[in-house]
Amino acid sequence: MLIGFAAAPAAAANAGVELPYDRGDMTFIDDGDVFKVCDTKADGHGVTGTLRGINHLTGKIVNLKSWDDGGDSGCDGGNYDVRGNSAHDMVLCWHGGGPCKVSRVFKENE
């Protein structure tokens, strides 16, 4: 499956993406460069959230970091230093199948 970047209007640096049917969500909090991935439905399937960016040498989209959540209480995640004017997005996938959801493109300096 090919998922690409799409232009987005300028907005606050915090960003998020949600799966349908309340299956899960992924959030970026600019203050501290914190990413949080939450499996929000007790359906036996977890979720994976992936941070992506552009490789400026090749122009290709690359996966920078992934976090999984499911089967435990609370959310998972961690820190990743999102820098300057580089475009990023997040992809959230449910382990039960179906299409992944992609966040808006965001930059730290928005």
Located regions from the model:
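Post-signal peptide N-terminal regions of Sec-secreted extracellular proteins
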Residues: 11-110
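Secretory targeting and sorting signals
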Residues: 1-12
